[in-house]
Amino acid sequence: MTHPTIGILHPGAMGISVAASAQSSGCVVYWVSDGRSSDSHQRAQEHNLQDAGTLDNLCATCDIILSVCPPHAAEQVAGQVIGQGFSGLFVDANAIAPQRAQQIGRMITEAGAAFVDGGIIGGPAWKPGETWLYLSGERAREVAACFEGGMLETAVIGPDVGKASALKMCYAAYTKGTTALLSAILGTAERFNVRSELENEWSRGGSDFAGQTQMRVRRVTAKAWRFAGEMEEIAATFEAAGLPGGFHLAAHDIYQRMAQFKDAPNLPELAKILTALSNDGS
């Protein structure tokens, strides 16, 4: 069986695990070193990705290109690939609203390439059964076959572009949305000097909810800069469904106030996080 060659844009924490799963399934995976960070270089070298050097070389070499990037950059990455005359299969696996996935799909197909919509649920795919790539589109099964031997689980949920992204948005609306809500609750309780009493109430009956919540808030700070944009996408998804998007627009603001902790070498103390929340992140 001949496996397709795959290009990954880009090998961040999630992207490199996606690339590794494709490699485990027999695919050769390429990346673009031009303009990328030292962390990306290190990840690519550790996992033996093939360096295409530039985007034009990647587009000329690969059968399938997967976009795994921050939500705000989804159209930019797709546009850059189109600009190189890519005529293969483009997979957008970013955390974007379904209507944006459909728009990108039109961009890609009008340029002469094929498109599959993807949505990743879970963290980086280093353990079986924990991370799922949902796929929708006419050629979704071709993409799923590229990961059948790796840690990344796949599920094809239909031919309609936007369906995979909609599922991702609905799932993250709860998981990441509630973390933002809990962060805001702790920040408010701290400001009114009732956090101790609140956490005591949470701890009745031996529950560890208070401790779990504190750790959940501390851990999310490293990714808050990225989650902020995702909350805007969820809000847009809700509004497209005729529902109010205000829940997640507020969650966007919460994560934006945490963005200063992106490159912290250690988990920040809860007190520092709550101060940042009540001071507009400054």
For every predicted segment, state its role:
Residues 167-269:
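Helical "substrate-binding/catalytic lid" subdomain
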Residues 1-60, 84:
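NAD(P)+-binding Rossmann beta1-loop-alpha1 motif at the extreme N-terminus of oxidoreductases
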Residues 29, 51, 114-116, 154, ...:
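Hydrophobic beta-strand scaffold residues
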